[in-house]
Amino acid sequence: MNRPSARYALPEFTERLSTGLRTLDPYSKLLDERIVFLGTPIDDTSANDVMAQFMHLEHLAPDRDISLYINSPGGSFSAMTAVYDTMQFVSCDVETICLGQAASAAAVLLAGGTPGKRLALPGARVLIHQPSLPAPVQGQASDLVIQAAELARTREQLEELLVRHTGQSPERVAADIERDKILDAPAAVAYGLVDRVVPSRKSSAAAPGAR
């Protein structure tokens, strides 16, 4: 698994099992607790890591929730849709929790959690905007036409996902993503991107929600 880089050495935990000692880093320990942490930009590598963890946890216990903690600036739309589709594909309910930020593609993953189980910490922020092409954009005129058509299709798909998971009208979503729309945690609840703001783990027990 490609773990987020740190400016210092991550601590390790040693546990005594019936089969002997086992040493874990924090991310492996979180996985034991059915917590997947997305703390990097979303690209093919991080998406593959998240998808592999989801499928592993579903195999271990298909009837238990998976918690996806998000602190990400967003990233690749295609990588995001791979994770999103996996979230919908697995039989487990997926609880999403935003701490820090869920921006751009990460906001869609936050909103795509199981209804009633989409949470944000008080200091979190969520940002939505329209997709864009990475710079520099190069190629022949015919190539640019193809890229423009794909960008328009991507925007339509993004709008459909936000409408589906927020309950906002297509017209409002289309207008809101024209420029960066930044929402604090209460505003994200009002918009429908998350269900509740949770100040502590004691208050994070989510009511069961239909998928």
Curated annotation (Swiss-Prot):
- What does the sequence similarity comment in the record state about its family? Belongs to the peptidase S14 family.
Name recorded for this polypeptide? ATP-dependent Clp protease proteolytic subunit 5
Q: Cellular component per GO?
A: cytoplasm; endopeptidase Clp complex
Q: Which Gene3D superfamilies match?
A: 2-enoyl-CoA Hydratase, Chain A, domain 1
Oligomer and partners: Fourteen ClpP subunits assemble into 2 heptameric rings which stack back to back to give a disk-like structure with a central cavity, resembling the structure of eukaryotic proteasomes.
Please state the Enzyme Commission number of this protein: 3.4.21.92
Any one GO MF term held by the record is: serine-type endopeptidase activity
Q: What SUPFAM superfamilies does the entry give?
A: ClpP/crotonase
Superkingdom of origin: Bacteria
Quote the subcellular location field of this record: Cytoplasm
Q: Which Pfam families match?
A: CLP_protease (PF00574)
One GO BP annotation of this record: protein quality control for misfolded or incompletely synthesized proteins
Active site annotated at which positions? S104, H129
Q: What does this protein do?
A: Cleaves peptides in various proteins in a process that requires ATP hydrolysis. Has a chymotrypsin-like activity. Plays a major role in the degradation of misfolded proteins.
Q: Which reaction does it catalyse?
A: Hydrolysis of proteins to small peptides in the presence of ATP and magnesium. alpha-casein is the usual test substrate. In the absence of ATP, only oligopeptides shorter than five residues are hydrolyzed (such as succinyl-Leu-Tyr-|-NHMec, and Leu-Tyr-Leu-|-Tyr-Trp, in which cleavage of the -Tyr-|-Leu- and -Tyr-|-Trp bonds also occurs)
Keywords from the named record: Cytoplasm, Hydrolase, Protease, Serine protease
Supply the InterPro entries for this chain: ClpP, ClpP/crotonase-like_dom_sf, ClpP/TepA, ClpP_His_AS, ClpP_Ser_AS
